[in-house]
């Protein structure tokens, strides 16, 4: 992990902590363009009662309308689900940096097969926070993508 990726992943991790402290799923994301964060978000599925309010989706919504996303890098603490991966592909995001895929393998190969550069950091803090959440709140984890194939 280079220092630039480490710094932006720390910001995504801070977003995950916000969600965790609000009683939600600890998944955070930031969008970076030209070395600066243009948007930050976290999973709000529990807080908003919205099953589509994943961390990556919240981050994208906060970025607002844009004509192009090809110069944007998305940092996310957990490997993206099918919905979030599809959104990355739909909007042409060319690079995704992932904190961890141990607690949920996500769709790394799907992204790569469509030409997205994927960097997997295997970040110990991201892994530990998600493991802690799953142990503490398995019923919330099981509501969504947990244990399902191809999501």
Residue ranges and their predicted role:
Residues 22-26, 69-71:
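Short secondary-structure junction motifs
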Residues 7, 36, 58:
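Active-site phosphate/pyrophosphate-handling residues
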Residues 27-35:
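Short beta-strand scaffold segments in enzyme catalytic cores
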Residues 1-22:
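Short, basic/aromatic recognition patches
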Residues 39-131:
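Zn2+-dependent cytidine deaminase-like catalytic core
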Residues 1-3, 13, 128-151:
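Secretory/periplasmic and organellar redox-cofactor proteins
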């Amino acid at each position: 992990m280079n220092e630039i990726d480490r710094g932006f992943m720390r910001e995504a991790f801070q977003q995950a902590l916000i969600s965790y402290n609000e009683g939600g799923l600890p998944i955070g994301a930031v969008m970076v363009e030209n070395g600066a964060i243009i948007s930050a978000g976290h999973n709000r599925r529990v807080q908003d009662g919205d099953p589509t309010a994943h961390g990556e989706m919240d981050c994208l919504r906060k970025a607002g309308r844009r004509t192009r996303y090809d110069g944007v890098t998305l940092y996310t603490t957990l490997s993206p689900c099918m919905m979030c991966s599809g959104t990355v592909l739909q909007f042409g995001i060319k690079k995704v940096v992932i904190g961890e895929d141990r607690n949920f393998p996500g769709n790394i190969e799907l992204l790569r097969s469509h030409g997205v550069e994927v960097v997997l950091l295997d970040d110990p803090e991201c892994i530990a926070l998600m493991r802690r959440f799953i142990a503490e709140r398995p019923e919330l984890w099981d509501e969504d993508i947990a244990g399902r194939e191809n999501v």
